Amino acid sequence: METLLGGLLAFGMAFAVVDACPKYCVCQNLSESLGTLCPSKGLLFVPPDIDRRTVELRLGGNFIIHISRQDFANMTGLVDLTLSRNTISHIQPFSFLDLESLRSLHLDSNRLPSLGEDTLRGLVNLQHLIVNNNQLGGIADEAFEDFLLTLEDLDLSYNNLHGLPWDSVRRMVNLHQLSLDHNLLDHIAEGTFADLQKLARLDLTSNRLQKLPPDPIFARSQASALTATPFAPPLSFSFGGNPLHCNCELLWLRRLERDDDLETCGSPGGLKGRYFWHVREEEFVCEPPLITQHTHKLLVLEGQAATLKCKAIGDPSPLIHWVAPDDRLVGNSSRTAVYDNGTLDIFITTSQDSGAFTCIAANAAGEATAMVEVSIVQLPHLSNSTSRTAPPKSRLSDITGSSKTSRGGGGSGGGEPPKSPPERAVLVSEVTTTSALVKWSVSKSAPRVKMYQLQYNCSDDEVLIYRMIPASNKAFVVNNLVSGTGYDLCVLAMWDDTATTLTATNIVGCAQFFTKADYPQCQSMHSQILGGTMILVIGGIIVATLLVFIVILMVRYKVCNHEAPSKMAAAVSNVYSQTNGAQPPPPSSAPAGAPPQGPPKVVVRNELLDFTASLARASDSSSSSSLGSGEAAGLGRAPWRIPPSAPRPKPSLDRLMGAFASLDLKSQRKEELLDSRTPAGRGAGTSARGHHSDREPLLGPPAARARSLLPLPLEGKAKRSHSFDMGDFAAAAAGGVVPGGYSPPRKVSNIWTKRSLSVNGMLLPFEESDLVGARGTFGSSEWVMESTV
């Protein structure tokens, strides 16, 4: 019973597995094979639930991008795999490792950029590989390694291939069809198709091939069907669309009998564009090589690099080879390199390289040769036990006066006692951090020196540095040294040895020295600190200067503010009444019954005292004439008298303009009073006019003279007048004067300027006689002169 149940369970599981099919796919179970068909189903990846026993799997026409190792794992029975017309751009290495039974792989019409060494690994039985219409730019040399002997059909057309692994193609002995059309191939290695005896179709259409290598396989392209055998089928060969270079190298191809005539010549210029099969055989010619440029002689120091150049032209382009002086062909090695342009580089020269190198340029039409003479300047070598050179066959033993020294015990026949140490022939002086001056001397009996060699090395390493110095120099400055380091330096002389016809060398002397230590970081820091300090000092000086300047301006401003009010408010006490014409009488001389005269209260601005000498004299004459007329008329008018004051500094422009404005205002007021005189006073006015002419200054009216001195018209400036008490003035004008010509002082309660009186409607038209009488009645202290500033 248990056996029956187990059998039923196994049958059910097998039936379920067989019936399992990926979504959107069609699974066909034909006899022993299982086919899974998923073409054009819009798949983005390989379905993971594909039956692993599938024999045929079609996934073409989808949108699969990536192939991973899990997609086809354990599908050992898969024979046909189609991945055409997808967007595959990457195949993970070893993705087909389990497909050991696969016969056909279609990867056409995808986006593969290249095929790596492990991309197709595991396809040991592959026969058909279709990879056309991709973006292949390169194929690894080992990409086809697993199926070289089984592959029958290889399609790599419509890609971007510049080359192929031709060695792998040569070993595909079972290859029947090879499609390489529509690529960028420009070269096919010679002998590539020699072993492809089963090749029936070769397509090289639309590439960049200029020539084809001669191969017997192409002779089968003209064989008839009668001569063909199963092991040597007729070859279908297509190579149209290539820019063939029609010269003697393609003459073998021209001699083949072919029916098609689609191939054309791309060069040379005389045959360009002509049909290949229509060109006569005698027109396929070549030009022998011609060497146009090469190195003639080269002198190289032993151990240094040497470059030999050789250029040649010809049709076809010649290949250049080099032959060493010992008749061996020079190739690429660790010491030499030969380039395609004909240049030979010797990285490290030796004494064996001395001689004539031969440049050989050869092509199908012939060859040309050129000689290059190379001379190697040999260098002395230092022994391991001492830093001095040991030339065993040197004959320059007397190059210095003390060079005949013993090499030390152990010498055969050396019974002579050791001599004293030689004098120093090499001196090192003027040692700095990076340079030193080396001087040496040679005895007069020494042979003629060809040149000197200076060699030195740092005590920390064993690398020697050489300097070649002309024989005329006995001193040399060694530069580019390391600071704070010890150096071992030797000077050697080189001359021509007539016995051996070689260059002989001998040591002149050696010396040791140490370069001075340098501290670039400390010096750099010191210079930075010094620069910053200078900037700070200069900035501090500028700031201090600005502060001092500001303080001086502030002090000057404060002093000016304190002095200005005191100057403008200075009172003039020596101003007396305009009616007495003299000094004020003392209290004892005052008339009886008169009240005591108080101190003068009149304050006069500085501008009224700063008159010129001419104006003062004119004012004095006017005052004297006015005084005479006033006494005759009984009005008791006193002249304006300004006592001389102490010499003052030169008045400013504002003060001078104020004085001129006051004089102008005074004259205008007098004219107005004369015009407004009443008929009752015409007689007095006539008398006054007569005296007015006497008081008038000789230079003209004061108003005209003041206007002529002012830079601007007076109408544009503010006009000021004498301030007086309105009520007292009116009372004085109406009541007359006190007998004796003296009026007691009155309090000036309301002081109005002319402008204020004019604005307020209180300016009264007084006559000049009344105004003069009022001035005589009032004391001088009742008049206040305002500044015009």
UniProtKB/Swiss-Prot annotation:
Disulfide bonds join C310-C359. Glycosylated. It is found in: Membrane; Synapse; Postsynaptic cell membrane. Residues 407-416 have a biased composition (Gly residues). Keywords: Cell membrane, Disulfide bond, Glycoprotein, Immunoglobulin domain, Leucine-rich repeat, Membrane, Postsynaptic cell membrane, Repeat, Signal, Synapse, Transmembrane, Transmembrane helix. LRR repeats lie at residues 53-74, 77-98, 101-122, 125-146, 150-171, 174-195, 198-219. Residues 289-375 form the Ig-like domain. GO terms for biological process: modulation of chemical synaptic transmission; regulation of postsynapse organization. The chain crosses the membrane at residues 535-555. Residues 619-638 have a biased composition (Low complexity). Belongs to the LRFN family. This is Leucine-rich repeat and fibronectin type-III domain-containing protein 2.
